[in-house]
From Swiss-Prot:
PANTHER family: ELONGATION FACTOR TU, MITOCHONDRIAL, ELONGATION FACTOR TU-RELATED. GTP hydrolase that promotes the GTP-dependent binding of aminoacyl-tRNA to the A-site of ribosomes during protein biosynthesis. Belongs to the TRAFAC class translation factor GTPase superfamily. Classic translation factor GTPase family. EF-Tu/EF-1A subfamily. It comes from Pseudomonas fluorescens (strain SBW25). The gene is tuf. This is Elongation factor Tu. Pfam families: GTP_EFTU (PF00009), GTP_EFTU_D2 (PF03144), GTP_EFTU_D3 (PF03143). It catalyses: GTP + H2O = GDP + phosphate + H(+). Its EC number is 3.6.5.3. Residues 174-176 are annotated as: G5.
Amino acid sequence: MAKEKFDRSLPHVNVGTIGHVDHGKTTLTAALTRVCSEVFGSAIVDFDKIDSAPEEKARGITINTAHVEYNSLIRHYAHVDCPGHADYVKNMITGAAQMDGAILVCSAADGPMPQTREHILLSRQVGVPYIVVYLNKADLVDDAELLELVEMEVRDLLSTYDFPGDDTPIIIGSARMALEGKDDNEMGTTSVRKLVETLDSYIPDPVRVIDKPFLMPIEDVFSISGRGTVVTGRIERGIVKVQDPLEIVGLRDTTVTTCTGVEMFRKLLDEGRAGENCGVLLRGTKRDDVERGQVLVKPGSVKPHTKFEAEVYVLSKEEGGRHTPFFKGYRPQFYFRTTDVTGNCELPEGVEMVMPGDNIKMVVTLIKTIAMEDGLRFAIREGGRTVGAGVVAKIIE
């Protein structure tokens, strides 16, 4: 059979498995590729290959992640699976693999465990919008009442962290059976097929980056005699067209301006799009009115803030992080997009110190405003050295 070429016409959705160690995340990941290859014609990936996930670096942090892909009838899925709990924490906080939805794998034999809870909390903090549940190892549970009990526990846990527990789809099955091609009582391949159909129906198509409101972090500012001020950067999302009204947000008071030209590789364009490095010519803006670290945005789409709740991963000594813990009142630099801003860290009640390698919820107060939204990633630095990674969980002011 000829090798199929990647079908760009199918909408692309990013998912991943989350849940407690040994509840069957990797087995389910392998089973998904197997079932989808038989039903929808994508490639099979073996358990061992997923389990020995390669190391990758995201923002200087080493993370082991396995990436697989599979198709349903209507979509192309990119799926991430992490071997260790620490890898999940790092992955979700750095946004190395952002998920449009997560598959929570919970063993029906054991019920929710500490990491089940922690992964749901992390999903909430980093803004994973949808969770679908797969109750695994159901072939080991003879008692229907026990299954119901575990299902109720999982729903309660989801509701605790503001996911719609009562309405979350829960599929009951056995990933091992599906991987072995068995299907007694529809627990094997049928359950995985049902899972894929649920992903199709429950997780909506993600909004494409290009359809979101325009945002470009400013990396550099030039003044071109006779033409005015040009700001350069890589467009993070959306489209900017000549004559669009724009706002410059962060570090100082927000100012209003107009795009009078877009340049890329010294050519003039009518518009700049997400992912492109370009220069935007601004009308009526002086060279000294703008600086690196501000963002150029569609008016009203992003506001400047200084205080927020964050979920943070502190690099271990081995990862080049701090060798010693830090305490309340810690004042490092927070690196947002293109600039560092000093901020003060408030630790949760009862937490005296934070050790390298920990992940922690903290409240940060910056000394200058930054254009920010929930889900924005940042690095924590000391004198230019990265010592942590974080994500804005909730804006306070």
